[in-house]
């Protein structure tokens, strides 16, 4: 059978369940942070949509097709609060009513099964109280399912909402889970979901293979990759060496024999095209982590997340505008706007906006607007932030770093050459030279991944 899953798109009734996904998970509290972090934003549940979204998610298609991919199987589910159908019903609930299917365990990615654990914090196994099912942590002492956890399973179902940026760890936890399942003869079933940035933007530095880590598992993948998790899964299993095989030192370096033997099924969406951004889907955004609470923060993560690496740049305006606001110590909003406007970065504008400070009082900061989506290159701002940080700092902030700081920068940004040039040139670095090189390599990556794309372009000309 082709690695593209073929799904008969027959219509079925989509029922909403009553079982809450997050409540009832019991565990020890996460370890305290070494550095103070802003308070977690309050997440207000969105209402059930008045109009049925046009896009059917993988879980919707699975149910519409009569659950045939899981029928007669003992399964586990890797998911989080954003793993819901198009009505907002948790995938957990949907699978619990699947006929002739036995759901026996749950797995949780970074941020936990309830999505409230801060970035980077480890957590242990717990129990989902409403069902009594075990929840195995994949962001603690184990980063992939163990043989004991997989014992007796026929399939692991994965339903995770990604945000389209390479360092967001859900594509990594998926790959690690796939590796474990392939090694121990367990099928992987990926329920596909939209890339909220769409499937056209491919941008930023590719991941140098030696920079593999928990925030980067796919060699030569640009920071904004333009793929869905289902497409990434197909690439990880069936791709050739340049884009799928990691160095032997990696804990995700499977042999070709094991990868070929592994069984992967991707249940694709219906109605999604590559030119669709999240608002075009008609789906409501459910937070994927404590600070990615809106579609606006998804955009910001791609835009400024790398710019804060090993610099004094900060994101947010007080408690508000996660990843959309930017600040720099001892620089006023006007000074920041003037400095960044001088670079004439296409597709964005810097404006003053009011947020809420830590003391609850109003605070003014700089907000980054996307003014022209077609001209906007998602990651470009981050590299001018690096350049400006070196200009504003008394000493080059990219020299004199510890080995851990160097490693952190490289695994997030991906490019050894960019870091080396930052160390050498500091504020004199030639950003456009690197942007041009990365654009050329992004075009190559588009061609290398073309055969794994499951969805048409939409009304945008092919090849873009």
Task: Describe the function of each predicted region.
Residues 22-24:
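C-terminal motif of bacterial Sec signal peptides marking the signal peptidase cleavage site
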Residues 26-28:
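Bacterial signal peptide processing site
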Residues 115-119, 189-212:
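Glycine-rich, charge-decorated loop segments at or immediately adjacent to ligand/cofactor-binding or catalytic sites
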Residues 119-153:
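Glycine-rich oxoanion-binding loops at beta->alpha junctions
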Residues 162-174:
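Glycine/threonine-rich flexible loop motifs
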Residues 212-301:
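Conserved anion/nucleotide-ligand pocket segment
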Residues 271-349, 358:
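Glycine-rich, aromatic-lined ligand/substrate-binding cores of catalytic
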Residues 322, 327-437:
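Conserved functional hotspot residues or short segments at active or partner-binding sites
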């Amino acid at each position: 059978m082709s690695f593209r899953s073929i799904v008969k798109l027959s219509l079925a009734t989509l029922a909403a369940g009553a079982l809450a996904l997050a409540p009832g998970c019991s565990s020890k509290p996460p370890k305290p942070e070494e550095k103070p972090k802003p308070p977690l934003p309050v997440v207000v549940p969105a209402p059930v949509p008045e109009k049925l979204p046009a896009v059917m998610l993988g879980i919707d298609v699975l149910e519409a097709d009569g659950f045939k991919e899981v029928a007669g199987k003992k399964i586990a589910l890797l998911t989080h609060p954003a793993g819901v159908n198009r009505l907002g019903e948790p995938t957990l609930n949907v699978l619990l009513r699947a006929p002739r299917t036995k759901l026996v365990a749950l797995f949780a990615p970074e941020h936990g099964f309830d999505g409230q654990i801060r970035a980077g914090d480890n957590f242990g196994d717990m129990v989902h109280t409403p069902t009594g099912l075990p929840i195995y942590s994949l962001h603690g002492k184990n980063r992939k399912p163990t043989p004991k956890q997989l014992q007796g399973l026929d399939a692991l179902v994965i339903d995770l909402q990604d945000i389209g940026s390479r360092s967001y760890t859900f594509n990594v936890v998926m790959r690690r889970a796939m590796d474990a399942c392939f090694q121990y003869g367990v099928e992987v079933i990926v329920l596909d979901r939209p890339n909220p940035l769409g499937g056209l933007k491919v941008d930023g530095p590719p991941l140098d293979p030696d920079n593999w880590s928990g925030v980067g598992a796919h060699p030569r993948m640009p920071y904004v990759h333009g793929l869905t998790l289902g497409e990434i899964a197909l690439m990880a299993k069936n791709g050739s060496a340049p884009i799928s095989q990691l160095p032997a030192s990696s804990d995700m370096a499977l042999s070709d024999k094991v990868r070929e033997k592994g069984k992967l099924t991707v249940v694709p969406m219906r109605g999604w095209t590559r030119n669709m951004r999240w608002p075009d889907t008609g789906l409501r955004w459910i937070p994927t982590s404590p600070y990615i609470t809106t579609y606006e923060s998804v955009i910001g993560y791609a835009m400024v997340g790398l710019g804060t690496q090993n610099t004094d740049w900060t994101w947010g305006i007080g408690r508000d505008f996660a990843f959309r606001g930017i600040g720099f110590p001892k620089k006023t909003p006007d000074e920041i706007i003037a400095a960044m406007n001088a670079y004439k970065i296409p597709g964005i504008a810097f404006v003053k906006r009011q947020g809420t400070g830590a003391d609850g009082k109003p605070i003014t900061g700089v907000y980054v607007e996307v003014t022209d989506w077609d001209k906007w290159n998602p990651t470009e701002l981050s590299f001018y932030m690096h350049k400006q940080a070196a200009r504003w700092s008394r000493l080059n902030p990219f020299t004199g770093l510890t080995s851990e700081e160097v490693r952190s920068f490289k695994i997030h940004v991906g490019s050894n050459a960019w870091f080396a040039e930052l160390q050498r040139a500091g504020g004199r670095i030639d950003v456009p030279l690197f942007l041009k090189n990365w654009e050329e390599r992004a075009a190559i990556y588009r061609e290398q991944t073309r055969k794994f794309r499951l969805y048409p372009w939409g009304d945008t000309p092919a090849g873009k």
